[in-house]
Amino acid sequence: MILYPAIDLKDGQCVRLLRGEMEAATVFGDDPAAQAAAFEAAGCEWVHLVDLNGAFAGRPVNAAAVEAILARIAVPAQLGGGIRDMATIALWLEKGLARVILGTVAVENPGLVREAARAFPGRVAVGIDARKGRVATKGWATETDVMATDLARSFEDAGVAAIIYTDIDRDGAMAGPNIEATDALARAVSIPVIASGGVSSLADLLALRDTGSIAGAISGRALYDGALDLTQALQALRT
């Protein structure tokens, strides 16, 4: 299982939100590129980036910070937030992102996801953010009646590289991931599923790994708070 350290970008700074609330942002640093370099130095295989302003605005907002990160690191990076058309997808992939994550548009325009996955094989992921099993969009501000598992299954034949599943109520809360829901989603599809939200300890990571169904896990706050040691976690996942 791959561990993806997370860098959430708000106003050019590295922050973490509590349950997706922009007003509940904790600033962890004003040099996201240095943070990405530190994650790389610790041995991570990937970096997970989120343009929080972009998720709410529907367009890239923290482009300068993302480009600075891409210039600093050699490991692959994936980005979500505000990516809602083919031009933006193509631009980010040309700029050096390994993978883009499509969230809101996966609900509102699933045809775009299919088109992008065909155009850029292996480089398009779907972000499914759910509260009590129902998908939320537009930076989690809009709740839908779409069930997360149904949305995931709808992309089974689309060629997407991965599904990033976030349990909103666990995100940034240090309350542990929703292992049961994530495992159920992962077993419902053949697409690799990456867990996000609530990872607060090495035990949480190992519990996700031990399901045998989950391909990766994203962690942010636990790394910044020191509850999870990145080097130790990476070592544990490799054994």
Curated annotation (Swiss-Prot):
Coiled-coil spans in chain: none
Keyword Isomerase: yes
Pathway: Amino-acid biosynthesis; L-histidine biosynthesis; L-histidine from 5-phospho-alpha-D-ribose 1-diphosphate: step 4/9
Domain of life of the organism encoding this protein: Bacteria
One BP annotation, GO: L-tryptophan biosynthetic process
InterPro entries (UniProt xref): Aldolase_TIM, His_biosynth, HisA_bact_arch, Isoase_HisA-like, Isoase_HisA-like_bact, RibuloseP-bd_barrel
Gene Ontology molecular function: 1-(5-phosphoribosyl)-5-[(5-phosphoribosylamino)methylideneamino]imidazole-4-carboxamide isomerase activity
Main location: cytoplasm
This protein's name: 1-(5-phosphoribosyl)-5-[(5-phosphoribosylamino)methylideneamino] imidazole-4-carboxamide isomerase
Originating organism: Cereibacter sphaeroides (strain ATCC 17029 / ATH 2.4.9) (Rhodobacter sphaeroides)
Lineage, highest ranks first: Bacteria, Pseudomonadati, Pseudomonadota, Alphaproteobacteria, Rhodobacterales
Gene that encodes the chain: hisA
